[in-house]
């Protein structure tokens, strides 16, 4: 975005336009207010207005202001009331994190802000889960989903590193519309680079790496039950 007048964004948008299936170009975790406004002048379909690094009050106020601006530019918006950061050892007990979980009041406030997609915290973390594994509060998710959908807002899930396939499908059944998958998509790519860098031509390394990403993406489309829906 910051270089060559957004050339990479324009390239991605053109590729999406020429695709044989519907594809949107999304800007994730945009935490700079000026960058959000800049993104509105580029061919993004949606922008995550991520003000979660501010206090809860500032997050809501800034989100509401930026969501309004994005909508005047025809951009869909995503936001998160707060986030739980995982570490190398993960999260020991979600009971200690009750103050960081998304509350029903916050859901209603963000729905009222005009946001299109909401990424709540109900036990999911950004980062590692640690030896205890994933511990989600399903009742909280159910009520969050009820409040959000009543206001026409869709639920997004962040923090799905190494989720079992059956858990991901259970989340889809629970009403999650969009699932952000990053690390799991790239692991085979990283492994391919580590095993082959310096051993094969650079162009071959990249081409085969892209194939690894495509294979991982196809697998996750199957897991999320989105394959064949275009």
Q: For each predicted feature, which ranges?
A:
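Glycine-rich beta-strand-to-loop/alpha-helix junction loops that act as flexible
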Residues: 157-161
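Extended, intrinsically disordered, low-complexity segments
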Residues: 194-230
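Alpha/beta enzyme core
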Residues: 6-22, 29-151, 165-176, 181-194, ...
């Amino acid at each position: 975005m910051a270089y060559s007048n957004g050339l990479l964004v324009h390239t991605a948008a053109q590729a999406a336009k020429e695709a044989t299936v519907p594809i949107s170009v999304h800007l994730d975790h945009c935490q700079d207010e000026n960058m959000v406004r800049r993104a509105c002048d580029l061919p993004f379909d949606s922008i995550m207005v991520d003000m979660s690094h501010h206090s809860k009050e500032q997050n809501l106020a800034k989100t509401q202001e930026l969501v309004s601006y994005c909508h005047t530019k025809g951009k869909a918006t995503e936001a998160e009331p707060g986030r739980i950061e995982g570490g190398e050892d993960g999260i020991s007990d979600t009971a200690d994190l009750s103050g960081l979980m998304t509350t029903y009041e916050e859901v209603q406030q963000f729905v009222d802000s005009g946001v299109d997609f909401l990424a709540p915290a109900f036990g999911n973390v950004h980062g590692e889960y640690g030896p205890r594994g994933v511990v989600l509060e399903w009742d909280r998710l159910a009520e969050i989903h009820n409040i959000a959908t009543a206001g026409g807002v869709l639920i997004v899930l962040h923090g799905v590193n190494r989720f079992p396939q059956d858990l991901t499908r259970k989340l889809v059944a629970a009403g999650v519309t969009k699932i952000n998958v990053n690390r799991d998509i790239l692991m085979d790519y990283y492994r391919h680079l580590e095993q082959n860098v310096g051993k094969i031509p650079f162009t071959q390394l990249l081409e085969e790496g892209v194939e690894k990403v495509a294979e991982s993406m196809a697998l996750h489309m199957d897991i999320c039950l989105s394959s064949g829906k275009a």
